[in-house]
């Protein structure tokens, strides 16, 4: 559901840039924290986006053009695919541009929301090693993320709170398994505008790196019930310095049913 279901912010970083502790967790566009709400059964959504992560002294990654596709394959079950191009800039190394790692996943909501309980779901993902890690365009090995997400709406849906987290399993050379989690609060302001802010933290992603915590703000504009413009900017507030951002276009089809 587009109102709260935002996918995929951070690209899969690679090589030296990963060792420099990149943002390794993707989340609901344009935020890092995800939600448990799948695409409606028989519906589809597509994102075309770019995103960036700049770490002074360590380099930068710009993802784009990238495409995300989500399908409501069954009631309460969504299939997920991201195919990104990526540009990496690392001090002392040649710039690289090309196809990076492919993300696939399945979102399953096993508790639906009611007046007294939140909705809860899992969203396991695999980052397939389709990029050229020798050029810093991929991890070099397939790795996995295993999160659980919780969401509750308030005041007739004007306020929405998402929280949750999980574990990333990455056994590529120089990489580490780590935990991650976040808290996101969003407010619908009417006239097709929603804004939100979040705190997101993750453990050390690579040998020699440190845990990092981010503060991120953003939102989306809905010119119609099928099309949206997404945006966010953020910065680390603990750990290694990172400046991040996301801009994307979203389209859902067929037209959502009227509430």
Language-model segments: which ranges?
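Bacterial N-terminal signal peptides
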Residues: 11-22
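Bacterial N-terminal signal peptides that target proteins for export
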Residues: 2-13
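Transmembrane beta-barrel domains of Gram-negative outer membranes and organellar outer membranes
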Residues: 25-259
């Amino acid at each position: 559901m587009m109102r709260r279901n935002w996918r995929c912010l951070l690209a899969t970083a690679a090589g030296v840039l990963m060792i420099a502790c990149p943002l390794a967790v993707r989340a609901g566009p344009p935020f890092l924290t995800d939600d448990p709400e799948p695409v409606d059964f028989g519906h589809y959504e597509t994102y075309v986006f770019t995103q960036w992560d700049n770490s002074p002294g360590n380099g930068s990654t710009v993802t784009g053009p990238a495409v995300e596709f989500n399908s409501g394959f069954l009631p309460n079950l969504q299939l997920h695919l991201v195919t990104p191009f990526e540009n990496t800039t690392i001090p002392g190394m040649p710039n690289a541009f090309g196809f990076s790692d492919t993300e696939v996943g399945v979102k399953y909501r096993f508790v639906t929301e009611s007046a007294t309980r939140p909705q809860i779901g899992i969203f396991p993902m695999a980052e397939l090693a389709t990029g050229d890690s020798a050029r810093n365009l991929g991890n070099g090995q397939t790795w996995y993320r295993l999160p659980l997400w919780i969401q509750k709406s308030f005041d007739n849906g004007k306020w929405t709170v998402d929280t949750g987290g999980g574990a990333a399993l990455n056994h590529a050379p120089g990489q580490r398994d780590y935990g991650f989690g976040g808290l996101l609060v969003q407010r619908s302001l009417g006239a097709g505008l929603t804004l939100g802010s979040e705190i997101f933290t993750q453990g050390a992603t690579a040998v020699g790196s440190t845990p990092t915590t981010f503060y991120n703000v953003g939102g989306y504009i809905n010119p119609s019930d099928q099309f949206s413009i997404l945006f966010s900017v953020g910065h680390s507030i603990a750990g290694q310095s990172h400046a991040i951002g996301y801009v994307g276009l979203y389209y859902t089809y067929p037209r959502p049913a009227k509430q």
